[in-house]
Amino acid sequence: MPKKLNKLKTKSKVLIIAGSDSSGGAGIQADIKTVTALGSYAMTAITAVTVQNTTGVKSIVPINPKEIYNQVTFSSNDIRPDAVKIGMLHSTKVIKSVIKSLDQIKVRNIVLDPVMVAKGGAKLIDNKAINLLKSTLIKKVLMITPNIPEAEILTNTKIKTKQDMILVAQKLIQLGVKNVLIKGGHLKGEFVHDIYVNNKDIKIFNSKRVKTKNTHGTGCTLSSAVATFLSCGKPVKKSCELGIKYVSLAIKSNPNYGKGHGPINHLNSMNINKIFK
């Protein structure tokens, strides 16, 4: 077994607060696969049950906010997480419950993936919840990982270029978050540009675009990968770099399932030594 793989196989724990995806490609299912494949231990608090497949979302069944709080605190009081990944938060009541639970468990490494629209176009959060996320939750997390449409919604700013991405990331910093990773897959071009920004640094990660429709759950996967690397003690920027490499490999080896936007291959990380090259 490669030495670098041994380094990753720590006893770190990642708590995932997100919605369930019945197709298995995104949401809490993708998160668990990612954390487990990268060698850490996944804990969960489910915020909603979504009925969906690769062609779209059929319905969303919300979980009682009180039970979301109980899931987070009861699990964390027994097994303390080293990092938290937050995904789908569809209402103000859910966000308030999550904020209350985060105040209770006091974990530093919190990654927020502001899930707003499913790959097929279905809206996954209401407008009041977006405003609460911007005004309160964003200040409590270590980093946020929006894609371009999500970053546009959060800042009321259109993104057409890499420079626009940087400016929008800086606007998000002004909202109170310390680190921003904007995913650039929605911009056209031979390469995908993911941009990391904090108060002192700007880093552009360039990846050759994989021509495929099978990208369901890439955002969930990236944020969970970043949270996992953070849980192992890696710096934020390095965690972003390794997370992007992991997702890129998972897209390249996708199994081509389903009639729509198919899932990626989370277990490609069994060849995880490639990520460190």
Report the location of each language-model feature.
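Short, small-residue alpha-helix embedded
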Residues: Q29-T34, I153, T212-V236
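Acidic-glycine-rich active-site phosphate/pyrophosphate-binding loop
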Residues: P2-T10, G27, E190-F205
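Conserved N-terminal subdomain of the carbohydrate kinase-like
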Residues: P2-I16, V35-K119, K123, M270
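Short pre-catalytic strand/loop immediately N-terminal to key active-site residues, enriched for Gly-Thr
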Residues: I17-S23, I202-H216
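Conserved phosphate/ATP/ADP-binding segment of small-molecule kinases
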Residues: N127-I202
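Charged C-terminal helix
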Residues: K11, P62, K237-K277
